Amino acid sequence: MYDRAPRWLDCANRGSTEEHVGPGTYQVPFPKQQATGCYAPFLSLSSKTSACVVSSDAGQAVPGPAHYNVSQAQYNIRGGRSLQNREKRFKKLISDGPGPGSYNWPYLGTLCITTRQKTPRTPAVSRNIDIPSIPSSGKSHGYHLNDDDTIMRRTPPPSDNTIGPAYYNPQFDYPKASLKYKGVNFGNATGRQEFLKYSGPGPGQYDIIQKRKLHCENINIKREQEHNYYTYVPRLYEAIILQEEKKGVPGPGKYNIKSEFDMIKSMSALVNSPSFIFFSETERFEPIKSCTPAPGTYNEIRTAFKCPKKRFGLSLPFNQSAARFTEDSKAQKLPGPGFYDISTNIVKAQVKKPCLKKQPKTGFGSSVPRTLFTAQKKAFRGPGPSDYQVRGTHDELPNLNKSAAFLSRAEKTPPVRKMRLPAPGRYDVQKSYDMSQVKHKYMPPRTSVAKKRHSSFLSAAPRCLGKIADGPGPATYSPVLMKSGAIISFVKGPKRFQEFHGEFSPGPTTYELSPFLRHSLLKRTYNVTLPCSSSPNRENTGCPSQKATQKFQREKLQYFN
């Protein structure tokens, strides 16, 4: 990389200055003078090196970009000149005086001998500017160098097929639009230009090609005057007159042209219609009604479960002949709760022919049968929690649909104890919401056991629970029968299909309302108790929900004690 850099070895033998310093010992570089323009076209008199000159640098032998001065032809723009300084901001300073090391002064204490020594000069290769770019005839083809170092001129070919200068299209870097004058031409103008006004019509005021139109004029209506092209803005008193005239003109949708295929509407529908808006009698959004009848429109007597008995005469109260409470035919076909007997697996024959049964005489002309509370309780009583039987050990066969890994049937986790859910209404939801979300107050302990737990940060609470005196019943355990020749392994074999032991939840017929709330005719009094057939049965046989709550409270007290 640095092998071609020039090295000056004589600098090590001498000092900073030469031995002999004089007015001819150094060479001051002068700037080259450019050739002045002449009559030759296409910049033919610009400097150009000849092919015979051998230069040390290969880049200096061939003219590079921007070698020719074309600024005089490009920037000679006609127009005004702005007041600006065209001098360069940063000039290249060239000192005319000698530089350091040009003079060779003798050292102090030595004999000064003024002997001038000639310093060898290196021949400087410079470009020859005398040869023009368009050479003379017969010398434009160059020379040929022979083997004996003789130069021989090349002869021109018999025919010249080269393209002349008129066929070249020089491409400049700057477009013509950027070379135009962009200043203010106010100072360059010599006179004022007046705006010429033409008296003729302007563009778009007339149509050259006019089409003949057939004009139909009504005698009763005057022809509109089209010579007024200004905008008409009515005043207040004129706007009132125009609004009154508009009221006499029918609006959109006022006319309803009847078609041959339209259905004639009855006059009763127009009476009940709301008031018309915007003087229009047509409805904007008509309801889409289906032509098919709705479910329950027809009452077929042959397939109906119960047909209401028609009455004629003055026995009908309130001028009503329809039943007060109609029963759904789909609900009558399906069996209700308590319809099946689980113990016998036989459907109760409670469906009777309603036509053969004589209907009792009811009050207020109502034809809907009303049954007593006892009959309703017997008809709709479902199985309670005590009606189900616990599955015994003999019902299930051993090793039925079971697969165990390594023949192990030991249970991995102990069975979870079944907890009974409290009855609905046992908790006060509104009170708990107010205490937790609204007031943010905690209730004091209500029992003695809770007081012990709240004191001393639960230090008085027992660590182990007490022994439960009430043991499990005989049907609590469900033993798994094993084969006699089973191989016991140490690996646990879980069941493939395990049964889901859910928590105990009461059935739909576990709870029932009081007969005073359920029956509409029974009213509670303070002094007199109405005779009811269900009262003696209620004393002896308690409600299964009350039994469940009492047993749950008893187990809860035993659990805390």
Curated annotation (Swiss-Prot):
It comes from Mus musculus (Mouse). The keyword DNA repair does not apply. STPGR repeats lie at residues 21-34, 63-72, 97-104, 164-191, 200-210, 250-285, 292-299, 334-367, 421-438, 471-481. Residues 123-143 are annotated as: Disordered. Keywords: Repeat. The gene is Stpg2. InterPro entries: CIMAP, SHIPPO-rpt. It comes from the Eukaryota. This is Sperm-tail PG-rich repeat-containing protein 2. The lineage of its organism: Eukaryota, Metazoa, Chordata, Craniata, Vertebrata. Pfam families: SHIPPO-rpt.
